[in-house]
Amino acid sequence: MKLLVIGNGGREHALAWKLAQSPKVETVFVAPGNAGTAIEPKLQNIDLTAHQDLIEFCRKENIVFTVVGPEAPLAAGVVDDFRAAGLKIFGPTQYAAQLESSKDFAKAFMAKYNIPTAQYQTFENADAAHDYVNQKGAPIVIKADGLAAGKGVIVAMTLDEAHAAIDDMLLDNKMGNAGARVVIEDFLQGEEASFIVMVDGNNVLPMATSQDHKRLLDGDKGLNTGGMGAYSPAPVVTPVVYERAMNEIILPTVAGMKAEGHEFTGFLYAGLMIDQSGAPHTIEFNCRFGDPETQPIMSRLNSDLSDLVEAAIDGKLDSVTAEWSPQTAVGVVLAAQNYPETPKKGDVISGLDAANQVGKVFHAGTTANEKGDVLTNGGRVLCVVGLGDNVAQAKAKAYGALEKISFDGMQYRKDIADKAINR
């Protein structure tokens, strides 16, 4: 069968690569894809992004189903459009995707359904926001209401930082429409984890646990990014935390969306903050697989992903299980110079073949020129995954592979997975 994956990042490379491992799958088209998906066996890039063009392509090629990688097409209603055209697609509707595309929607939804999260208030007026922050004190978290590619969250450790973030979003319009409303919420202490599940509207199939590293620099310093690395499984998600996350967050969310008359289908990702007592709180929802969590998680999936997605689209997730490798996977992101602000593009990347002999290189912000050189083409350029019998081995494998790669201004964290090693 022929499948389609929408997107051009590392997450989409990993999803398409895993789907292509199925003996049932002939070709996975990736729209628009990157330099990695262009050369991966059984994968083929197509330069289409408009929903109608994609729908026509699916009809012409008899695509069995489509998987949506990134948040932007979901928020733009790609699932609604495909379903209206009678095509199978895995992802949430535009309404359901508001769990990610509007922080205010998500917080109000959590309050309504008693899902644990930080206390919050929403503001469109800068003066009112400044007053609220002065009353609450720091540390405090300022979030752009809309989609901001993972960079719309400012964890303000001082009042000055909080006031500056409010001005950036509400007065200086630095986030555009995404920051025209801000959600201000209490700062939560604890350790973060990514809890990702597949949902068919009613049933839930959990993916392996993982932990992302949001900050740019070692020791969780520097600016927030889309994610600088991840590992799976995440030891902070103990069996008790796992049960609580399912029963207090995931299942009430799925039931709540159904009660709202908008069943959630697709990947649902709860960003958790696990406090000292082991209680999980929801920091955010994403309506798709995480990036870079997808890369290590897919590296551990032994099941046929196409079977899981088909079951989910058909409302039969309760009839399948996911089998996981007992190994640990560590993925490290290589980012371009000046990421996350104004990443430099167009630098030649060398050493990819050598790196792929040691680990697995997933492409994100890459493109190829006429000569066949692979060039940087975005903020997060590559994610290098290593597998090992324990976290330390997997980390050594990932960094061993990464050392083969070079491009001008390459930056990466050297401490990915150290939290798990030091536990």
Curated annotation (Swiss-Prot):
**Catalysis: reaction(s):** 5-phospho-beta-D-ribosylamine + glycine + ATP = N(1)-(5-phospho-beta-D-ribosyl)glycinamide + ADP + phosphate + H(+)
A single GO BP annotation from the record? 'de novo' IMP biosynthetic process
The protein's Enzyme Commission number: 6.3.4.13
Start and end residues of each ATP-grasp domain: 107-314
Q: Part of which pathway?
A: Purine metabolism; IMP biosynthesis via de novo pathway; N(1)-(5-phospho-D-ribosyl)glycinamide from 5-phospho-alpha-D-ribose 1-diphosphate: step 2/2
* A Pfam entry, by short name: GARS_C
The record lists ATP as bound by 133-194
Keyword Translocase assigned to the entry: answer is no
- Signal peptide start-end: none
GO MF terms, alphabetically ordered? ATP binding; metal ion binding; phosphoribosylamine-glycine ligase activity
InterPro entries the UniProt entry points to: ATP-grasp, ATP_grasp_subdomain_1, PreATP-grasp_dom_sf, PRibGlycinamid_synth_ATP-grasp, PRibGlycinamide_synth, PRibGlycinamide_synth_C-dom, PRibGlycinamide_synth_C_sf, PRibGlycinamide_synth_CS
Q: Which UniProt keywords apply?
A: ATP-binding, Ligase, Magnesium, Manganese, Metal-binding, Nucleotide-binding, Purine biosynthesis
Q: Which residues are listed for Mg(2+) binding in this entry?
A: E284, N286
Which superkingdom is the protein from? Bacteria
Family, per entry: Belongs to the GARS family.
How is this protein named in the record? Phosphoribosylamine--glycine ligase
Q: What are the top taxonomic ranks of the organism?
A: Bacteria, Pseudomonadati, Pseudomonadota, Betaproteobacteria, Neisseriales
Q: Gene for this protein?
A: purD
